[in-house]
Amino acid sequence: MKNQFAVLLVALVLLQLFSQSEAFWSTLLSIGKSLLGKRGLRNFDLEQMDDTYEPELSEADLRYLQDLLR
């Protein structure tokens, strides 16, 4: 009985691992298709990346980045 329970637990863990990795890869594949497709490249907005870049950095920001990268 203990062996059957252990086999069941291992099977459930492996099933969860497979299903989660399948969802991850399918999401990654759909993102790649949307970016590389004809419509995806035409509708890709480069201005949405502007929020991640701040051209004006203060001295405190530069010092913090230098300390962070050491």
Swiss-Prot record:
Expressed by the venom gland. Its main location: secreted. GO terms for biological process: defense response to bacterium; defense response to fungus; killing of cells of another organism. One of its GO terms (cellular component) is other organism cell membrane. Residues 1-23 form the signal peptide. It comes from the Eukaryota. It is found in: Secreted; Target cell membrane. Keywords: Amidation, Antibiotic, Antimicrobial, Cleavage on pair of basic residues, Cytolysis, Fungicide, Membrane, Secreted, Signal, Target cell membrane, Target membrane. Residues 37-70 form a propeptide. The keyword Transferase does not apply. The modification Leucine amide is found at residue 36. The keyword Membrane applies. Antimicrobial peptide with potent activity against bacteria S.aureus (MIC=4.7 uM) and E.coli (MIC=31.5 uM), and pathogenic yeasts C.albicans (MIC=25 uM) and C.glabrata (MIC=12.5 uM). Is not very effective against P.aeruginosa (MIC=150 and >300 uM). Also provokes moderate hemolysis on human erythrocytes (HC(50)=10.5 uM). Belongs to the non-disulfide-bridged peptide (NDBP) superfamily. Short antimicrobial peptide (group 4) family. This is Antimicrobial peptide VpCT1.
